[in-house]
Curated annotation (Swiss-Prot):
InterPro entries: Beta/Gamma-Crystallin, Beta/gamma_crystallin, G_crystallin-like. Crystallins are the dominant structural components of the vertebrate eye lens. Residues 26-65, 66-112, 119-160, 161-209 form the Beta/gamma crystallin 'Greek key' domain. Has a two-domain beta-structure, folded into four very similar Greek key motifs. Residues 113-118 are annotated as: Connecting peptide. Belongs to the beta/gamma-crystallin family. This is Beta-crystallin A4. Residues 1-25 are annotated as: N-terminal arm. The gene is CRYBA4.
Length: 210
């Protein structure tokens, strides 16, 4: 898709779109031991802390429906892990692509607006939606290979759907989940990407599967 980062975005296709949450239910089952062993608990809504259930951490899980984001610490803090439909028999199944694996997952919540078929994101060179910009509606394992200069993104506006940005190409490194129903889709600075964000470095981006 050569030239996809070179055009400007008109006001009618810009930041005025409303986010539509995907219809459906969310269900996740977690265990306190690897291999789906030990104590088990099922959720259909957010869990701010598995510690309150007597779990030290989640060590295996199955996502039965919907998309979820897991967090290293209670209260939706720390590293983020995208959890799409499927089985995760051990912690490295959800943290295998990160360069900074953490053997803890203690809170999680649904990604309500994930919509793989209708996802659109504008990336900006500088914070506060300044500088060069480009519009994305597909998965990009390397932004630089698609024409984006440098290895940083200053700010984002999520028009629709939910996205996961990664620090390095190939969806590696820290993950940052961006949703159209959080911050009104506006992420003006890396401080709004998550409590673990320390840099503007983003080199791959993909849509979250519902």
């Amino acid at each position: 898709m050569s030239g996809m980062f070179s055009g400007s975005i008109s006001e009618t296709s810009g930041m005025s779109l409303q986010c539509t949450k995907s219809a459906g239910h969310w269900k996740i089952v977690v265990w306190d031991e690897e291999g789906f062993q030990g104590r088990r608990h099922e959720f259909t809504a957010e869990c701010p802390s598995v510690l309150e259930l007597g779990f030290e951490t989640v060590r295996s899980l199955k996502v039965l429906s919907g998309a979820w984001v897991g967090f290293e610490h209670a209260g939706f803090q720390g590293q983020q892990y995208v959890l799409e439909r499927g089985e995760y028999p051990s912690w490295d199944a959800w943290s295998g692509n990160t360069s900074y694996p953490a053997e803890r997952l203690t809170s999680f919540r649904p990604v309500a607006c994930a919509n793989h078929r209708d996802s659109r994101l504008t990336i900006f060179e500088q914070e506060n939606f300044l500088g060069r910009k480009g519009e994305l509606s597909d998965d990009y394992p390397s932004l630089q290979a698609m024409g984006w200069d440098g290895n940083e993104v200053g700010s984002f506006h999520v028009h629709s759907g939910a996205w996961v940005c990664s620090q390095f190409p190939g969806y590696r490194g820290f993950q940052y989940v961006l949703e159209c129903d959080h911050h009104s889709g506006d992420y003006k600075h890396f401080r709004e990407w998550g409590s673990h964000a320390q840099t503007f470095q983003v080199q791959s981006i993909r849509r979250i599967q519902q």
